[in-house]
C-alpha cells in the first residue's frame, strides 16, 4: 500500500450568492491564515473559486468549515496528495467575476449551462460521430496536454473564447459539442453561453480534467500529456494507462513537459524547454528577450557581459548553420 503524502492540495468552486465579497474575502483570509493554509481564492457575488494547500489536518478543518456554511452546502473538493505546499502565500481576493468572460449580458450557470457528463459518459461521447471536443482553456494549457482530437482555440485568455467561437461558427453548427477545462468552472459559463448562442447539443465534463483523471473506471484514458495547474506543481498526470508526451520544446521541437517563464520580466511568456535549452538560450523566448537589460536568468546566474555575448554568438552561429 502506498504511503500517503503529508500535504493536500484542494481545488474547488461553487456558484452561490455571496452578498459582500470584499467583507467575505477579508474574513476568509483571516480564517485561512489561522489554519496556516496557502493558496489563491477568488470571491465574487456569484460565488467562490479556490485552490489551497496545507497538511491533511489543516485541509480537513477547512473543508469541514466550508461544508458547514449554508452558502456552500454541497460544495465538492478535488483533493490531491502532495509532499509540501503548492503555494508560497495565501491570497483571498474579491473579483467582479470568478472567471473572466466580460460578457455584456453575463451567464448565470445556476440558470443556464450545458449538460453535465460524468467521466465515463464523456469518454464515450468523445468517440461518437459528429462530435466536436473544444478545450476551453488557454493555448499554453492545451500545449502541455489535452484530450486526443480536441480542438485548440488559439486564445491567450478565457475572455477571447466567445469571439473565437463566433469566427468558427460554421465548423461547429449542427455538431454535438463537448467542452472541458481543469476543474469545471470555466465550462459552467462557457457551455451556458454556447446554449444561449443557439448551439443545441452542448455538454461539459463534470468536475473537469482533474476528476476525469481520478475516475477509477476511465482512469484518464484518451488524455495525452499532462494537465496544467495554476500552482507550483505546474503539471499533474491524468492518464493512468499510458503517458503520451505532446508538449514540444520551444527551441528544438523535441518532446518536453517542462514549463518556464521567459526571463524578460516584460514578456514573462510561458515556454516549454529543457534545462539544457534554458541555459543555452538564457531562458528567453526570443533574441529581444535574451538581450533585455533586465533578463532574470542573467541576473540570477550573475553572468558577465562576456558570457552573455558568448552565448549569443553561439546561438547565432548555430542559426547560420541551419540556414546554410
Curated annotation (Swiss-Prot):
Q: Does the keyword ATP-binding apply?
A: no
What Enzyme Commission number(s) appear in the record?
A: 1.14.-.-
Gene3D superfamilies per the UniProt record, alphabetical? 3.30.70.100, Rhodanese-like domain
Catalytic activity annotation: uridine(34) in tRNA + AH2 + O2 = 5-hydroxyuridine(34) in tRNA + A + H2O
One molecular function GO term is: oxidoreductase activity, acting on paired donors, with incorporation or reduction of molecular oxygen
Instruction: Write down the top EC class of this protein.
Output: oxidoreductase
Please provide the record's keywords in A-Z order.
Answer: Oxidoreductase, tRNA processing
Q: Which Pfam families match?
A: Rhodanese (PF00581), Rhodanese_C (PF12368), UPF0176_N (PF17773)
* CDD domains referenced in this protein's UniProt entry, alphabetically: RHOD_YceA
Q: Which residues form the active site?
A: 181
The Swiss-Prot or TrEMBL record describes its family as follows: Belongs to the TrhO family.
PANTHER family, A to Z? RHODANESE-LIKE DOMAIN-CONTAINING PROTEIN 7-RELATED (PTHR43268:SF3), THIOSULFATE SULFURTRANSFERASE/RHODANESE-LIKE DOMAIN-CONTAINING PROTEIN 2 (PTHR43268)
Cite the NCBIfam families for this sequence: PRK00142.1-3 (NF001135)
Q: List the protein's name.
A: tRNA uridine(34) hydroxylase
As recorded in Swiss-Prot or TrEMBL, the protein's gene is named trhO
Amino acid at each position: 500500500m502506498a504511503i500517503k503524502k503529508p500535504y493536500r492540495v484542494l481545488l474547488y468552486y461553487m456558484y452561490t450568492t455571496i452578498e459582500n465579497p470584499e467583507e467575505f474575502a477579508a474574513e476568509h483570509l483571516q480564517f485561512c491564515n489561522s489554519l496556516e493554509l496557502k493558496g489563491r481564492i477568488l470571491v465574487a457575488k456569484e460565488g467562490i473559486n479556490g485552490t489551497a494547500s496545507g497538511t491533511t489536518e489543516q485541509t480537513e478543518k477547512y473543508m469541514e468549515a466550508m461544508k458547514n456554511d449554508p452558502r456552500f452546502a454541497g460544495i465538492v473538493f478535488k483533493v490531491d496528495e502532495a509532499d509540501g505546499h503548492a503555494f508560497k502565500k495565501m491570497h483571498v481576493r474579491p473579483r467582479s467575476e470568478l472567471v473572466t468572460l466580460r460578457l455584456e449580458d453575463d451567464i448565470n450557470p445556476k440558470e443556464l449551462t450545458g449538460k453535465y457528463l460524468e467521466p465515463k459518459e464523456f469518454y464515450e461521447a468523445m468517440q461518437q460521430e459528429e462530435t466536436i471536443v473544444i478545450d476551453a482553456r488557454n493555448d499554453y494549457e492545451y500545449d502541455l496536454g489535452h484530450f486526443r482530437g480536441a480542438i485548440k482555440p488559439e486564445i491567450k485568455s478565457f475572455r477571447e473564447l466567445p469571439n473565437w467561437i463566433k469566427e468558427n461558427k460554421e465548423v461547429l453548427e449542427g455538431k454535438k459539442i463537448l467542452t472541458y477545462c481543469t476543474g469545471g468552472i470555466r465550462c459552467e459559463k462557457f457551455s451556458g453561453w454556447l446554449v444561449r448562442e443557439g448551439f443545441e447539443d452542448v455538454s461539459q465534463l463534470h468536475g473537469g480534467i482533474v476528476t476525469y483523471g481520478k475516475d477509477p473506471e476511465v482512469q484518464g484514458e484518451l488524455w495525452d500529456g499532462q494537465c496544467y495547474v495554476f500552482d507550483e506543481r505546474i503539471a499533474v498526470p491524468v492518464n493512468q494507462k499510458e503517458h503520451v508526451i505532446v508538449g514540444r520544446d520551444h527551441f528544438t521541437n523535441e518532446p518536453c513537459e517542462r514549463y518556464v517563464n521567459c526571463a524578460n520580466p516584460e514578456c514573462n511568456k510561458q515556454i516549454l524547454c529543457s534545462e539544457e535549452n534554458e541555459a543555452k538560450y538564457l531562458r528567453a523566448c526570443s533574441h529581444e528577450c535574451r538581450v533585455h537589460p533586465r533578463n532574470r536568468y542573467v541576473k540570477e546566474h550573475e553572468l558577465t557581459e562576456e558570457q552573455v555575448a558568448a552565448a549569443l554568438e553561439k546561438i547565432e552561429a548555430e542559426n547560420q548553420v541551419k540556414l546554410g
